[in-house]
Amino acid sequence: MPDLLLELRSEEIPARMQRRAAEDLKKLVTDALVARGFLYEGARAFSTPRRLALHIAGLPARGEAVREERRGPRVGAPEAAVQGFLKGAGLASLDQATTVTDPKKGEFYLAVIERPGRETLDVLAEFLPEIVRSFPWPKSMRWGAASAEPGSLRWVRPLQSIVATFGPETETPEVIPVSVGGIAAGTVTYGHRFLAPEAIEVRRFDDYIQALERAKVVLDADRRKDVILHDARDLAFARGLDLVEDEGLLEEVSGLVEWPVVLMGSFDESFLDIPAEAIRATIRANQKCFVLRKGGSEDLAPAFILVSNLVATDGGQAITAGNERVVRARLSDAKFFWETDKATRLEDRLPKLDAIVFHEKLGTQGERIARIAALAKDLAPRVGADPALAERAARLAKADLVTEMVGEFPELQGLMGRKYAALQGEHDSVCAAIEEHYKPLGPSDRVPTDPVSIAVALADKLDTLAGFWAIDEKPTGSKDPFALRRAALGVIRLILDRGLRLRLLEQVGAADRSLAGRAGADARDLLGFFADRLKVYLRDQGARHDLIDAVFALPGQDDLLMVVRRVEALAAFLDTEDGKNLLAGYKRAANILRIEEKKDGRAYDAAPDAALAAAGEPAERALAEALAKARETASAAVAREDFSGAMQALSTLRAPVDAFFQDVTVNAPDPKLRENRLALLNALRAATREVAEFAKIEG
């Protein structure tokens, strides 16, 4: 079956955009094919710094014919309806339509629309130009004289050529007749800009990928990554060193080269006095190079791995020397930052934070630090931390933001603060908290274990959330400019991973009170936000979101650890036959109550009359007794936080509830008896509310 080959060659595409662009190209083209009724066997997208490529295998040469029957208005319908039907069906007159008879509704017009299958080549030529014109680059540009014209082509970098062919593997494929921005599709591409700048004639994918390989272009980004990684490991091993692997840097570097050549450079050993993290940040950020460790050690070696896009005639000596000069200059800067920063104590830097605005409505960083310190001191006893150490750590936690090193490398915030604090003799817990108070940064990041770190981390995140809630800067849809979802997830993970008992409303209130002179946060709304984040977090671990809703619907549910334990007990209960049947009985009772309360215009929320129930049917009396006992037992179990015991108490209701619905008529002719039986159903609803709001549970 025929294949499609598409290449869009341009000036250098930013590395961070390449992989997403390749996937976008595949999705746009395959979606367009499927929408037009064309199926295919497989599709692969590729990217290099200078091209996006797509190969779709197993396309039909021609689409299948389509026969569609479209029913129109009733015979004798108004003229406007008839004309609308004819226009929609593409018919010139009713003579081209037939009629069908519906035994119940009468005679109707019917249009039989037959569309012959179209040549795949024609269909591709129809939609490919529009895909190129509307391609979803995060940033794009116009260029050349045509850029002044309205609607001129936009691309991430100037587009230079298009290869677009379609045909069977065993025959010479045809060029798809497309032209975009004055660039007509053809069969000519180019290899490596410097190593093989000559034109290459290609026809089909197998020819294309082999021709590029000969022209010093590795088309597959994952293969380029593999080449870089293994060559770097081998080169390091040959020198008795270990590569410090960096997936993010590897991904970026593989997008900077079409023909990766791995080389090793070195720097003066005196630079190893600089913290290893600073050396790595310097070499990574400025030169896109990998650092190395001494063999079998955690200590850095005075060497680095660089990746060139050239096969140099001198074996890469000039390229390596050039990189070494730049690395030496950058490390000299880093050493200056390190020595300069060590000369000033962290607390002496705090006045500078008073001049840095955190947010125009939330004051300066200095004001924020004062709030975090007060909150950390208050939280400390609740998490087993020393209040004085927690307050001290919070006061110093942001001081490194005004150091030279963090000013140059913001990603080192916290880490450099920890090192400077250790040098000035701070307590180990204070040092750890300065680095760890930013954690956890995501669902898989490590959660701090030191109580002082936990206190400061909670204070930092709660202050952020309460502050932005107070000024109504909440996340909306996909927008979360202040990373409030991440902050809430951080609080949740700190509480759950460390088994902390905290009343969130109380802590939000404390954070709120520290925002003196500013409007307070809506604590209930913020608690709802925590509930949403908790649902996302637990759902990823297999928990049911409706059970979380059912627990949060109860009053006073701001102790997240207890919420989760209650959810776990509820899930275990509902997995049993007793749980499933009780839920079904609850749903039936709630449905009856809803109907009768709506009909009567009143709520049946009074306690049932025990004497009246005792005088009624045996099943009625048994349910009344079981409800009273189960509610009392469940309430006591919840009070001592024995949620499994509470569920066990509810499980005793299964048999009497089943018997009640089987043997008792709720809507009895006697009004008093009917009212009391409805009150019994309400008592069932009230009993289940001891553990959760069953109305929120699905199923």
From Swiss-Prot:
SUPFAM superfamilies xref list: HD-domain/PDEase-like (SSF109604)
Binding partners and assembly: Tetramer of two alpha and two beta subunits.
Major localisation: cytoplasm
GO molecular function list: arginine-tRNA ligase activity; ATP binding; glycine-tRNA ligase activity
Protein name: Glycine--tRNA ligase beta subunit
Annotated keywords: Aminoacyl-tRNA synthetase, ATP-binding, Cytoplasm, Ligase, Nucleotide-binding, Protein biosynthesis
Reactions accelerated catalytically: tRNA(Gly) + glycine + ATP = glycyl-tRNA(Gly) + AMP + diphosphate
Organism superkingdom: Bacteria
GO CC, alphabetical: cytosol
Biological processes, Gene Ontology terms: arginyl-tRNA aminoacylation; glycyl-tRNA aminoacylation
Family of this protein: Belongs to the class-II aminoacyl-tRNA synthetase family.
E.C. number: 6.1.1.14
The UniProt record lists the keyword rRNA-binding: no
Location in the cell: Cytoplasm
Gene symbol of the encoding locus: glyS
InterPro entries in UniProt: DALR_anticod-bd, Gly-tRNA-synth_bsu, Gly-tRNA-synth_heterodimer
